[in-house]
Amino acid sequence: MSLLQLSPLLALLLLLCSSVSETAADYENTWNFYYERPCCTGNDQGNNNYGKHGADHVREFNCGKLYYRTFHMNEDRDTLYVGAMDRVFRVNLQNISSSNCNRDVINLEPTRDDVVSCVSKGKSQIFDCKNHVRVIQSMDQGDRLYVCGTNAHNPKDYVIYANLTHLPRSEYVIGVGLGIAKCPYDPLDNSTAIYVENGNPGGLPGLYSGTNAEFTKADTVIFRTDLYNTSAKRLEYKFKRTLKYDSKWLDKPNFVGSFDIGEYVYFFFRETAVEYINCGKAVYSRIARVCKKDVGGKNLLAHNWATYLKARLNCSISGEFPFYFNEIQSVYQLPSDKSRFFATFTTSTNGLIGSAVCSFHINEIQAAFNGKFKEQSSSNSAWLPVLNSRVPEPRPGTCVNDTSNLPDTVLNFIRSHPLMDKAVNHEHNNPVYYKRDLVFTKLVVDKIRIDILNQEYIVYYVGTNLGRIYKIVQYYRNGESLSKLLDIFEVAPNEAIQVMEISQTRKSLYIGTDHRIKQIDLAMCNRRYDNCFRCVRDPYCGWDKEANTCRPYELDLLQDVANETSDICDSSVLKKKIVVTYGQSVHLGCFVKIPEVLKNEQVTWYHHSKDKGRYEIRYSPTKYIETTERGLVVVSVNEADGGRYDCHLGGSLLCSYNITVDAHRCTPPNKSNDYQKIYSDWCHEFEKYKTAMKSWEKKQAQCSTRQNFSSNQHPNEIFRKPNV
């Protein structure tokens, strides 16, 4: 039978073979070792094909799209206060799902007149002309709350009880009502505020804020409210603010955080870099500080800060030409550790997108503020450090008992020299973590101490603009800081994470987006990992090799966060035995879907055979094929392919298969799997025929171009006849 006569039969059989799924042809790969349980999205349970996914570690609070963008946590009261559109919610820290949208809330809607005025200025009635709560701070040991909202582009502040009820008229708080310079006009503007009860002039409490102080956004300000003696209902100290319309002090800043530490209040923000303006436009990240006892100058700077200083924050990849992440997006400080700040940075959105996490030590910050000042002698000159001999005494920016007694030379100097020369460098010469094509929005940090092992881990939870959380662990080995990505999980797909908080008492992470709030247990363990390899690298978890499960860490469990013991999980790796038919193609794999955190890791397959011993598999299109999930396809198995196949990630064993080849090629089939094996062999044979057919057709096409164009030439002639 010729190849041409066989082609209809080939076409039919090849069509049948191509309609068979890969899992039918490679029937052995219907079972895998690893899968990653879903984490935090609402439909996880319905889509989980690998066992029931308990949702007890993920809880949600949702009262509609209310722009949940402000958190204030009070662990003593087991409460998370949430600022939203026209509302403040009181959410149960233990279980946010138990909170009620109608009961645990106070409504703070703007008046009709405020809304009408807002709309008349061209603002949206359904978003802009609402009261978006942007500041919630505890007062009086948490008995009362200070609240400030945009109030239809007419900022307004309130003092309410911690149970979300209004104060009676008899408890009116003087100085409260007008929220200008305390929170923004525009709900989309970044701002920060912190209520400071100790260390201020006269020991009086007051709010420190960083925000826009005008509807037009022309006046940005770092501000402290008037300080009142509440018992006497008397103003003791007037407000203090940055110099108005002076780009050396502030130039279009975006504020991201503020902190009360010792004698100072620190502010973190990004702004247009005045020192770079002669070379073009750039945005730099800053840290600024003011003394809490600052009362301004006597004649100069009477209503302004007399101790205001700022310095650049440097988050960059080190090198001869460092790569800078110039735009700070968020900052966090552990309540138990005032010596460090952790922050997320991004590149400019106009160029190559990238994000990084950097940490800063208070000693490096103090060194920058104690260093040289920077100045520009004329509008066309470069910015240069100021000689120490030109710095007046007492040193500008130093906290003194009464700043109104500072000499004019000091006040004049600080008025024109608020910028420090030295940047604040991040720790360890490199970011904790960085990644391109990613926008980090918020972060929180946890610290885990295992005393018996004398080991400390810092765990970063970093939110993105697409609703994902990157979980990163940092640890020290021989004095060197090391960090690695542990996990990536989706919390709110395609929603930007707007705010985050973490509770040590409840061991929970809280995430806010415009649509919802979610609570996630820090120790997910068996609800996230089904295998030893992933489990032992999470500092919250440990592998129980007796029960073959992942549990919250205890001393008798396996754990290897630093990956120092590559074979720690070898005894826990499941090993599968497979019998395959001669000529069969078999698919071996460890993952149903490879976790994203492992996609860039090197996966290596090894074959242990009788003839060659142990050797590394080299991929080839005719024998060994790598799948998209790092699995291995062995094509057309023969006796030499028998033996053990091990899959390694780095030095760690992930999974193992022991293959036995059935050399009796004509064994009568006795079950459905045997029929599938034979059918797979036929498909393999017809693939060979298909290849031969294509080769024949190609040669036929080449021959047809050589045919004689004369009408009397025989179609089968291979030589051209000479013309007669």
From Swiss-Prot:
PROSITE patterns: IG_LIKE, SEMA. Its main location: secreted. Transiently expressed by a single large muscle during motoneuron outgrowth and synapse formation. Residues 1-25 form the signal peptide. Disulfide bonds join 118-129, 291-399, 315-358, 525-541, 535-550, 590-647. GO terms for molecular function: chemorepellent activity; semaphorin receptor binding. The keyword Signal applies. GO terms for cellular component: cytosol; endomembrane system; extracellular region; plasma membrane. Residues 552-663 form the Ig-like C2-type domain. Disruption phenotype: RNAi-mediated knockdown in the neurons of adult males, reduces survival to 77 percent. Adult survival begins to decrease from approximately day 9 post eclosion. Pan-neuronal or glutamatergic neuron-specific RNAi-mediated knockdown decreases adult climbing behavior. Glutamatergic neuron-specific RNAi-mediated knockdown also increases activity, at least during the light cycle and results in a significant loss of motor neurons in each thoracic cluster (T1, T2, T3). It is found in: Secreted. Coiled coil: none annotated. Residues 45-522 form the Sema domain. One of its GO terms (biological process) is dendrite guidance. Keywords: Developmental protein, Differentiation, Disulfide bond, Glycoprotein, Immunoglobulin domain, Neurogenesis, Secreted, Signal. InterPro entries: Ig-like_dom (IPR007110), Ig-like_dom_sf (IPR036179), Ig-like_fold (IPR013783), Ig_sub (IPR003599), Semap_dom (IPR001627), Semap_dom_sf (IPR036352), Semaphorin (IPR027231), WD40/YVTN_repeat-like_dom_sf (IPR015943). Glycans are attached at residues 95, 163, 190, 229, 314, 401, 563, 658, 670, 708. It comes from the Eukaryota. Ligand for transmembrane receptor PlexB. Plays a role in growth cone guidance. Required for both proper adult behavior and survival. Can function as a selective target-derived signal that inhibits the formation of specific synaptic terminal arbors. Function in neurons is essential for adult survival, motor neuron survival, and is important for climbing behavior and activity. During embryogenesis, plays an important role in correct salivary gland positioning. PANTHER family: SEMAPHORIN, SEMAPHORIN 2B, ISOFORM D-RELATED. Interacts with PlexB. Belongs to the semaphorin family. This is Semaphorin-2A.
